Amino acid sequence: MIEADRLIAASGRDREEVQDRAIRPLSLDDYIGQPVVREQMALFIQAARGRSESLDHTLIFGPPGLGKTTLANIIAHEMGVSVKSTSGPILERPGDLAAMLTNLEPHDVLFIDEIHRLSPVVEEVLYPAMEDFQLDIMIGEGPAARSIKLDLPPFTLVGATTRAGMLTNPLRDRFGIVQRLEFYSDKDLATIVSRSANILGLAIEDLGAYEIARRARGTPRIANRLLRRVRDYAEVRGKGQITKAVADMALNLLDVDERGFDHSDRRLLLTMIEKFDGGPVGVDNLAAAISEERHTIEDVLEPYLIQQGYIMRTPRGRVVTRHAYLHFGLNIPGRLGEGGDFSEPGDE
């Protein structure tokens, strides 16, 4: 199973990038949720504009689908400048980065997604560009090679990553602003769904928007994807209007339950309960039992279930918590009762 194949996958898809562009907010006033980030960025941007300076280099990190690219575009829009976008894996050689840097206008934003995947040689070129707005380029080869310095206009680098821990210390230290995006509340997601529906010209009730939001795993990208699929259902079977009942029937048909779990999530939890008595079970045994790769369990399935308190990692293996039994309407084993060995999701 591949993450991108799942309806509730947080990772993006190429076609969605085009679709999301139409509903993406362009200003901080339209940016929903993340109140601390929004307030801080409004302050930093206003101060930079007041001094006629470029904004400090900004690092945005957090789980996929929370709006890192959206925030980068908002920064450029609020600063009144252009944004040039690329990603870490695309910048394979120093020349690739140099070409982008030399095409920037004063105060422009250079957005690098997946910045943790920059190659070391490209990262070395980025250091003086960020710090001194200079580009060191090697001309020629062998004994005749020489280094020349090119002055760059002041610019803002906005880096986005889902894995801030993989950034090297020298790169991380060069960002003057660091922002972490958190999962969204159901209320904020419902507002996002209603806004997207309005832009798309869809008739949606508040309860219909909330029904989609509460199954979107705290992630705007998933909420907007579910909205499109519920729209299909509403147009064919619901007279074009998205009510709570229509959203519920559509999402049940799509196999997304009230907690945002899909078939793969439920299969993992039920396998642990039915075949391994709730655990502890090693990840290799679990992978064999559900015919998945180990990394799929660790990188795709587990994170959300752990974050929601349905699975724990312990020194002896994975265990399900009492929440998993309650979700399926099963009797809770005595060891998972109040004060049991695994009753607290944060313990290991």
Swiss-Prot record:
Name this protein carries in UniProt: Holliday junction branch migration complex subunit RuvB
NCBIfam families recorded: PRK00080.1, ruvB
Major place of residence: cytoplasm
Region (Head domain (RuvB-H)) location: 258-348
Reaction equations catalysed: ATP + H2O = ADP + phosphate + H(+)
EC number: 3.6.4.-
Oligomer status and interactors: Homohexamer. Forms an RuvA(8)-RuvB(12)-Holliday junction (HJ) complex. HJ DNA is sandwiched between 2 RuvA tetramers; dsDNA enters through RuvA and exits via RuvB. An RuvB hexamer assembles on each DNA strand where it exits the tetramer. Each RuvB hexamer is contacted by two RuvA subunits (via domain III) on 2 adjacent RuvB subunits; this complex drives branch migration. In the full resolvosome a probable DNA-RuvA(4)-RuvB(12)-RuvC(2) complex forms which resolves the HJ.
GO cellular component annotations of the record: cytoplasm; Holliday junction resolvase complex
Localization (cell): Cytoplasm
Broad EC category: hydrolase
SMART domains per the UniProt record, alphabetical: AAA
Binding site for Mg(2+): T69
Domain comment, as recorded: Has 3 domains, the large (RuvB-L) and small ATPase (RuvB-S) domains and the C-terminal head (RuvB-H) domain. The head domain binds DNA, while the ATPase domains jointly bind ATP, ADP or are empty depending on the state of the subunit in the translocation cycle. During a single DNA translocation step the structure of each domain remains the same, but their relative positions change.
A GO BP annotation: DNA recombination
Superkingdom, taxonomy of origin: Bacteria
Gene name for this UniProt entry: ruvB
Role noted for this protein: The RuvA-RuvB-RuvC complex processes Holliday junction (HJ) DNA during genetic recombination and DNA repair, while the RuvA-RuvB complex plays an important role in the rescue of blocked DNA replication forks via replication fork reversal (RFR). RuvA specifically binds to HJ cruciform DNA, conferring on it an open structure. The RuvB hexamer acts as an ATP-dependent pump, pulling dsDNA into and through the RuvAB complex. RuvB forms 2 homohexamers on either side of HJ DNA bound by 1 or 2 RuvA tetramers; 4 subunits per hexamer contact DNA at a time.
